């Protein structure tokens, strides 16, 4: 299916993306950070779910969900298809940057066959809606090695200049 977003053009296998993404949504992580994301994202960024759905991606089925802090997130969605033309303007949904990376350039740990591209959604700030204190959440996100990896990832992302095909 051909999809246009601003001056970007995509050819996407929506049915395959829906099949994979809905399976991931049914089997997603239940740590506090992820539960907070699933609970807060729709009310905070109401246009994000319909935007991702155009590509067949379920907002609750990211391939990777990275909390940089308890309320700062980046969600990565692998989209089967091709970027036909990269736009000259960055994509924003509800003020959130959406960075598009083609295939293996995205540095995602995946066994999926190409062609695919990755949509990195965020950084997005969400309110903390859970009753537990985020400092008490048991998650890899509280480990120093994870935080160091996320810091490195963020610094690399800043260098992407929000346009990377």
Model-predicted regions and their roles:
Residues 59-116:
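Amphipathic protein-protein interaction modules
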Residues 32, 80, 120:
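Residues in well-ordered beta-strands of folded domains
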Residues 101-165:
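Glycine-rich, aromatic-bearing surface loops/beta-hairpins
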Residues 36, 82-86, 124-126:
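Generic structural motif
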Residues 27-72:
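Short, well-structured hydrophobic secondary-structure segments
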Residues 48-52, 79, 150:
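Generic structural signal of hydrophobic/aromatic residues within well-ordered alpha-helices
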Residues 1-42:
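Long, hydrophobic N-terminal alpha-helical segment
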């Amino acid at each position: 299916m051909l999809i246009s977003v601003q001056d970007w053009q995509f050819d996407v296998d929506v049915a395959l993306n829906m099949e994979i993404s809905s399976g991931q949504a049914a089997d997603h992580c239940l740590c506090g950070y992820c539960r907070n994301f699933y609970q807060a994202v729709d009310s905070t960024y109401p246009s994000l779910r319909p935007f991702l759905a155009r590509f067949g991606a379920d907002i609750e089925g990211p391939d990777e969900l990275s909390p940089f802090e308890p309320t700062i997130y980046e969600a990565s969605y692998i989209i089967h298809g091709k970027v036909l033309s990269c736009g000259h303007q960055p994509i924003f949904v509800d003020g959130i940057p959406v960075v598009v990376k083609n295939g293996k350039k995205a540095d995602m740990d995946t066994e999926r066959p190409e062609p695919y591209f990755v949509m990195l959604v965020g950084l997005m700030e969400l309110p903390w809606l859970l009753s537990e204190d985020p400092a008490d959440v048991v998650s890899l996100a509280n480990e120093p090695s994870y935080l160091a990896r996320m810091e490195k990832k963020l610094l690399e992302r800043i260098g992407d200049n929000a346009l990377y095909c």
